[in-house]
Amino acid sequence: LAQIVNSGQRRVESLETPAILDAVFFNEHLDFSNVPFREREEKRADWHSRALAALDGCEIVFVDPDNGLMVPSARRSKKANKYVLPEELFDYYRQGASVVYYQHKARRQDGFYTDQHNKLLQDERIQDAEGLGLKFTRTSLRYYWFLLRPEHAETVRQCVASLLAGPWGDCFELC
């Protein structure tokens, strides 16, 4: 990490090596800026198919949209690429992965985001999923919501408990 910092290459892509993080990455940007309205849905579907293929076989998939779960007001806008669709989360889950997704906290009460997550958990496509949520409470507030497969739930709960008991514990709270 020091080498990356000292080189001036402080970009996420610099961390995407097995020497630093033993993980699979799909970092293809979904951009609608020059895409006509009628073509956005197909472009998104193609992008998502590539993401599914790249992440097939992963036990945990972390989804990091700019804003979080899709809201109705953004679904048809050029900014729809800043959100993840529930169907996309369900696809990763059905592929065998537990899913963690990022949610930026905008000007809504906590209950709005909890309700969104609970609504996902009620969907029959992930009926066996266990939900978990972490709220980052420092600076800009954000959530990390979990859709856990039964075979991963206990291990992830233990890891979250360890995080909360450690030096980062004061920065998070369970939702």
Regions found by a protein language model. Give the residues of each.
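Class I S-adenosyl-L-methionine-dependent methyltransferase catalytic core
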Residues: 1-175
